[in-house]
Amino acid sequence: MLDFEKVIPEDVGISSTGLISFARKLEYNNIPMHSIIVMRHGKICMESYYAPYTRDTLHRMFSVTKSFVSLAIGLLADEGRISLDDHIADYFPEKQPETGVHPYMQMLTIRQMLTMRTCHDKNAYKIGGSPDWVGSFFTVTPDHVPGTNFSYDTASTHTLGALVEKLTGMELLDYLRTKFLDELGFSKEAFILKSPDGKVSMGGSGMCATPQDILKVMYVVSQNGKLGGKQLLPSGYLKEATVKQSDPYGKSGTWEEMQGYGYQFWMTTHNGYAFFGMGGQLAIYYPDKDVILVTTADVQGRQGGVQLIYDAFYEEVYSHIDACTYNGDNSDYEEFQKFENSRQLLVQPGEYSSDLVSKINGQSYEFDDNPCGVTDIKLTFNGDEGTFFYTNATGNHELHFGLGKNVFQNFPDYNFKCGASAAFRADNNLLIKVQIIDSSVGNMYISLSYIDDYVTVMMRKIEESYFTEYDGVFSGKLKN
C-alpha cells in the first residue's frame, strides 16, 4: 500500500512561497479549485483541499477515466488476450447491424482507438441517442477512414472499456483492482458510473475517486509500472502510451492539448504527460524534474481555465525548482501550512450588500410560459444569507445561498450536493452561483435583474448531463 511521506517543500527543492503564489494566482483568476497535490521524488510537498472537499472526498474525474481504460487494455495485451492491432468489430458481432458494419468501422483497430484516430469525428452516442452506447458506436455511420485524423471520441474509449469488461467478466474498476489498484491502497469506495442502459462502466468519463487515488496511479506509471521491485504494469506498453502517437494540433482548445496524444494520455509542454479530465481534473508527470501535479477543479464555463492552471504552475513553481534550499528557518513553511490547510471553495465575487434588498425582500413575481417552466419566484434575506423560492413543473423549491460565503445543501429535484453563493453585480441585479459538488460536477448561474415592477431571470447551467430545465431567459411581473 502506498503511503507517501509529507515533507517541507524546500526539502525537495520547491519553494513554499512559490506554492502559495501558485494557488493564490488561481484564486485571483477565479479558478474554482477543489484540491492541489504536488509531489517530487516520491514525496508530497503540498496537499490542499478546498472545503468542503477533504482527502477522502470522491471526485468525478471525467476523462481521467480514459487513462485507466488504457492501462486495462495494456494489461490485457500483456496477458496475450488481445493485440493492439486487432479489429474492434471482431469482438462485438452482436452489436453490429444485420447488414454488417461500415467498411471504415471494419478497418478500425484497438491501437487506432487508443490514439483517438477512429472513424468517428464526434461521439457516436451523442448522435445516435441510444442508451446502448456500445451499440451506437457500431451503428452510427462513420465519417472517415480510421488511422488518419485525430478526433476526440469518448464513445471509442467507452467501447474499449466494454471490451475489458466483456473479456474479463468483471467491471472495469474491479479488474484494475485485482491487477494493481488494491496493492496501491486505491479507495474501496471509488466507483465508475454506468452508461444509460446500466450495463457498462462509463469508461470515457465516469470514474469517481480521490485525488490521492489518482496520484498513486500516476506515481506507478512514472516508475515505469514498477512498485517495490514488482512490475505491476507492463513497461513496454507504458513507454508507448506516454509518448506522442497522434497529433491533436488544431483539434484541441488549449496550447497544452496541442502537444500530442499517446494511448489515452495527453502530452504537455516541458516534456510531460497527463491524465486529463474535463473541468481541471489533472495528474501530470514531468520526468525532467520528477514532479507530479494533481488537481481537481471545476473550470467548466471558465474560458481557458485549464490552461491557466498549467501556466500558473509553470510560472510560480516549475520554473523555480531547485532554486531554493531549506535553511532551517520555518517561518515560510509555517505560513505555507496555514495557507495549505485553510482553503475553501470560491464564492461568487461582487458586492454583498445593496439597497436592492429592501425593495425585493419577500416580494413575489409571477411568469407566463417560459423555457424553464418557472411560474413564480420570491427572494428573502436574513443577514448574510438568503433564500430563492421558486415553483416549476416539479413543485415548490427552495435554494439557500450565502452573501460572501457558500451555503451547502442538496440541490432541489436532483439531490446533488451543492454550494450556493450570491453577490450584487449591479444596483438592480443579484447573481446566484450554484456549484455542484457530487458525482455530477458543474455550476449554474441564476441572475435576477429588476426594473420597476418587472424581473428578468437568466438561468444558465454549465454541466454535461443534467439541469436542462435550468437554462433560459424570461421575465415576470410583481404579483398584485
Give the predicted meaning of each segment.
Residues L238-T296:
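Active-site Gly/Thr loop motif
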Residues G277-V347:
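Structured C-terminal helix/loop/strand segments within mature extracytoplasmic catalytic/sensor domains
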Residues I20, G42, H59-D85, M113, ...:
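Active-site SXXK
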